[in-house]
Amino acid sequence: MAKRKIVKKKVVKKNIAKGIVYISATFNNTMVTVTDEMGNAIAWSSAGSLGFKGSKKSTPYAAQQAVEDALNKAKEHGIKEVGIKVQGPGSGRETAVKSVGAMEGIKVTFLKDITPLAHNGCRPPKRRRV
């Protein structure tokens, strides 16, 4: 029997200078997506995809690692300037924003909070009693 060759799709390097970093910080995880100015995804990462399990996904350290991973992938495509859009109430939110600013070779142009706020919409879940 002849073995089948597995052909991997070659990653096309795009040359994009400006982009937007979307940081979604939920209570359970932190997701980071780097897009170009049109909104096409270039690179993404999350605390869960880096191997953090359970309650460790929601830590600020996991958020920092997710940002660094996503931006290192985006640097391969030539990203030099980014704007930051942050969404959600998670604990890794501030750490993620700081680690974008601390990345070498990446200039931050703007910072915007896009957390959706309900104007008396659905009833929120009941408060936890611990």
From Swiss-Prot:
GO cellular component: ribonucleoprotein complex; ribosome
Origin superkingdom: Bacteria
Keyword RNA-binding: yes
UniProt xrefs under SUPFAM superfamilies: Translational machinery components (SSF53137)
Keyword terms: Ribonucleoprotein, Ribosomal protein, RNA-binding, rRNA-binding
Pfam families the record matches: Ribosomal_S11 (PF00411)
Keyword Manganese in record: no
GO MF: rRNA binding; structural constituent of ribosome
GO biological process: translation
Subunit field text: Part of the 30S ribosomal subunit. Interacts with proteins S7 and S18. Binds to IF-3.
Family from the record: Belongs to the universal ribosomal protein uS11 family.
Task performed by this protein: Located on the platform of the 30S subunit, it bridges several disparate RNA helices of the 16S rRNA. Forms part of the Shine-Dalgarno cleft in the 70S ribosome.
Official protein name in the record: Small ribosomal subunit protein uS11
